[in-house]
A protein has these predicted regions:
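N-terminal cap/lid segment of alpha/beta-hydrolase-fold proteins
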Residues: 44-74
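N-terminal twin-arginine translocation
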Residues: 20-30, 37-49
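Gly/Ala-rich beta-loop-alpha elbow adjacent to hydrolase catalytic centers
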Residues: 176-180, 184
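Short beta-strand element of the alpha/beta-hydrolase
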Residues: 76-84
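Short amphipathic alpha-helix adjacent to the substrate-entry channel of hydrolases
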Residues: 90-109, 113-114
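N-terminal secretory signal peptides
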Residues: 1-23
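Gly/Ser-rich "nucleophile elbow"/oxyanion-hole loop immediately N-terminal to the catalytic nucleophile
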Residues: 125-173
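The feature captures the conserved acid-bearing segment of alpha/beta-hydrolase catalytic domains
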Residues: 205-228
Length: 228
């Protein structure tokens, strides 16, 4: 629990530190701790016009509600985004949109679809709140298994490969935050012929003393990685 809380705080701090450099103290205090933080970020230079929709991805365990966004014209490399412990929410939709503006077809997933539809947390709620933790931790435990992650990864890759906006001649990238970090590694190992790049930010549990530690999957991957 402590590790997940730290990761969640790091994700918010990254956005906050960027914002501090762009706004006055009064403006920053008004927007801090809100999805509005992400909305203040400037558009990507030369940003593509994009289109985004809520989609449902069929998996062996049900239907995963996700957000799919991509440039309005043409075919582009696919990207899977795994959110942190607070799940798919407006801030991650905006992050996915910014990535799509750079020329990618982005699927931002609800990792907790087995338990609840997104969003699973109200804007402004903190993981440090015991009531919020009590609500989210069962979702996390239902998701954070190697077998479950592999099942979902294969379903999400298959979804992307079936989209007209995805260039299937190019490999897929995947990125994850906090609890999404280990899922990125498992995704790369589960479909090494399709995953060509991975990035984890504030990833928790990338290396453990368990026999299924994500780092032990490295020999099974064929992807370039950024671990930050």
């Amino acid at each position: 629990r402590e590790l997940l809380s730290m990761c969640d705080e790091d994700t918010e701090r990254d956005a906050a530190e960027y914002l501090k450099s762009k706004l006055s103290r009064r403006e920053f205090n008004t927007l801090a701790a809100s999805a509005a933080v992400m909305m203040t970020l400037p558009r990507v230079v030369g940003a593509a016009e994009v289109t985004g929709n809520d989609v449902n991805v069929t998996t062996p365990d049900g239907s995963a509600d996700c957000f799919f966004v991509h440039p309005a014209q043409g075919k582009y490399p696919g990207v899977i985004v795994w959110p942190d412990i607070r799940g798919l929410r407006p801030a991650f939709r905006m992050m996915a949109t910014r990535l799509a503006e750079s020329g990618y077809a982005v699927l931002c997933v609800n990792p907790f679809y087995r338990s609840a539809k997104a969003p699973v947390i109200a804007e402004g709620e903190s993981f440090n709140n015991p009531e919020v933790r009590a609500r989210l931790m069962p979702y996390y435990h239902a998701t954070a298994t190697a077998a479950t992650n592999r099942v979902d990864a294969k379903a999400f890759v298959a979804f992307l490969d079936a989209q007209r906006s995805v260039d299937v001649t190019r490999k897929i990238g995947t990125t994850g935050y906090c609890m999404g970090g280990p899922i990125v590694l498992r995704t790369a190992a589960a479909i090494p012929d399709r995953i060509g790049a991975g990035a984890t930010f504030h990833g928790g549990g990338l290396v453990t003393d368990q026999p299924d530690s994500p780092h032990l999957l490295i020999p099974e991957m064929d992807a370039a990685f950024l671990i930050a």
